[in-house]
Amino acid sequence: MKLQNKWFIGAMLGAAVCLVSTSCVDEIKFGNSFLDKAPGGNATIDTVFNSAEYTRQFLNTCYSRQYYGLPYNTDSNGNIPDSSSPYLGKKDALTDCWSLYFSDATVYQQYYLGSLNANYGTRGNIFPYTREMVWEVVRWCWLLMENIDRVPGMDSTEKTQLVAEAKCLIAARYFDMFRHYGGLPLLYASFTGTESGYEIPRATVEETVNYMIKMLDDAINSGGLVWAYADADLASKAGHWTKAGAMALKCKIWQFAASPLFNDVNGYAGGNSEAEQQHLVWYGGYHAELWDNCLKACEAFFKELESQGGYSLNKASEETPEQYRQAYRMGYIRQNSKEVLHSVRTNMSDAFNSSSYMWHSWAVPSLCRTEYPPTQEYVEMFPWADGTPFDWKKTETEGKLDAMFLTGTFKNGEQLLSEIVLTRDPRLYEHCMVNGLPKMLDWSAGTMSGLPYELWVGGYDEGQNAALESGNYATGYKNMKYYLGTEYQRQYTHWVYLRLSDIYLTYAEALLQAKNDHRGAIDQMNIVRARVGLKKDLAECVTDKNLLSDKAALLEELLCERVRELGLEDSRYFDLVRYKRADRFEKRLHGLLAYRLDD
C-alpha cells in the first residue's frame, strides 16, 4: 500500500417539512411572489390570515425553506436555497476530510481552482447572501407574527406556539448566515412594499448575536414550545421547533460567537480593515464572558434535559462493533431518533433513483456529482477499537497494515472472510466505505452481511478510480454518511440540524475554554465515545500528550472528536473556520492506493 498525494485548496473565508393536512380546506402554496404583494396584494394576506388552516400552511412554507445540508435539487429559479444544489457542492469538501471531483460544482470551480471573487452570480459562492432563502423566511415569519392575532378559529395557546416557532426559524436562518458573514442587517418587521427605502445598516457581530439570542429567549420563555414531542405526535410534529431545539441552538450560537474568528485579541485580517474597525466581523477584542455565556447555555440545556428527559444518545443493544455501528447510525438517520434535537425534511422516502432527491441518484458511478470521498487524513483520525490513536508509521513498523480496518479467517477454502472483527472506532465504518467491509448492515437487526468492498486498484468496486483520482472511490474510499447502502432505499430521509452528541461536545469545549476544566471536558467527550464502545478514559488512551494539563492538545483532540462524531454534518468546516485553521484548509491531502499481494 502507498499513500497517494493530492492537493486541495480550501477557502476560509430546504427543504420542506412535509406535513399532510387532513382538513377539507384547500391547500394554498406560497411562492416567492407572495413577498411582492404590496397594498394591492393585501387581499392575499387577508385570505391567508383569515383562516387557521391557511396560517398553519403558511408557517409550513417557512419551514420548507430551512437549510438542508445535503445537495438534493438543481432548481436555479430561487425557489430553494442554492446550497441545496449539487452544482454548488457541500462545504465539507473544502476541509481536510473530504474531497469533491465534480468539476462543474462551485466548490471545484471557484474554490479548488482559486477563481472566487466578489463578483459572483448564481451559485458562485458557498453560501450566497441573497440566494439562500434567508431573508424570505425572515420576512414571512414577521408577517405571521404581525397578523397572528387576527386569525379566527385558532386559540391563544396555538397562536403562542406558532409565534415561538417563527422566532426559532428567524434565529436559525440568521445563524445560518451569521456563520458565513458575521454581522447582518437586523429586521424587526415585514415590509409592505410601499416604503420609501430599504437601506438597513449592517449590525455588529455583538448586535447580531444578541438579536438571535433574544429571539430564542422569547420563544423559550413564551411557554409556547414543548420540550419534546411524545412518540404519538412525532408523525405530524417532528421537524417543528421545540424548547430543546431552541436551547441547543443557543449553545451553538454562543459557541460560534465565542470562538477566535470573532473573539480574539486580533482580527483575522489584522484589525485595520473597515469591517474590523466597525466590529462587523469580530467583537473588537477578546471577551472571556462569551465562553461563560456558552457554558451557561449548555448547563441550562443539560439541567432541563435531566429534569424533562425525552432525549438520549442511541445505545447499542449488544457490546459488539456491529451494534455500535447500528447505534451510531440510527442515532442520526432515523427520523424519530431520541438524539435528534431538530431536523429538516425535503421529501418522504427515497428509492435512490429519484430526480427530486439527487443526493442519492446523482451519486451513481455514471455521475458522481454528489460523491464526497473521504481523505486519508480523515481515516487516520479514527482510533483503534480500544480507543488508542491510530498511527500509520507505527502500524506499518509492526506489520499490521493488513489489519488496519478488520481481521477475519478463511474457512474450508472459502474466498470470503468469516468471523470478521472490526479493528477501529465503529464510527469509521459509518463514515467511510473501506476495503473488506461487508456491504450490508441490516436496517433493523444491525448485522453485517453481503460481499465485501473491494477497494484496491483493479478491485470490483474501486476499479481504476483511485489510480486515476476520479469516480466514487477517487481517494481509495467512498462516503458512507447519509448514503449508507441498499438498506437505506425507500427509508425516510432528513437532515439533522441539531443533535445531542454535538451539544455534549459543545459543553466539553465550553468547560475547557471558560473554566480551563480539562477533566470536565474529557468527561463529556467520554460520554460520546462510550456510545460506540470506546469506554476507556480518553486521557488514558492518548499517552503521548497530557490531556489533563495541555490545553492546546486537548482542544485539538476535541476538534478531532467532533469530526469523528459529526462527519459530513458541516461541523468540520465551521470548526476550522471559527478557529482560523488555515493550516488545515491548505494542508496537502492524501488518498490510499492499495494493491492485492498476488497482483
What are these regions (language model features)?
Residues V25-T106, L184, K243-M247, K252-G458, ...:
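An aromatic- and glycine-enriched ligand-binding surface/loop that stacks and positions planar moieties
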Residues M177, A257, A514-K515:
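Structural motif corresponding to the intra-repeat A-B loop/turn of tetratricopeptide repeats
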Residues G446-T447, Y482-Y483, S501-Y507, D517-D544:
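Active/binding-pocket-proximal capping segment
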Residues N42-D75, S99-Y181, S196-A238, D402, ...:
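Conserved, well-structured interaction surfaces
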Residues V20-S23:
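C-terminal motif of bacterial Sec signal peptides marking the signal peptidase cleavage site
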Residues K2-A11:
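Bacterial N-terminal signal peptides that target proteins for export
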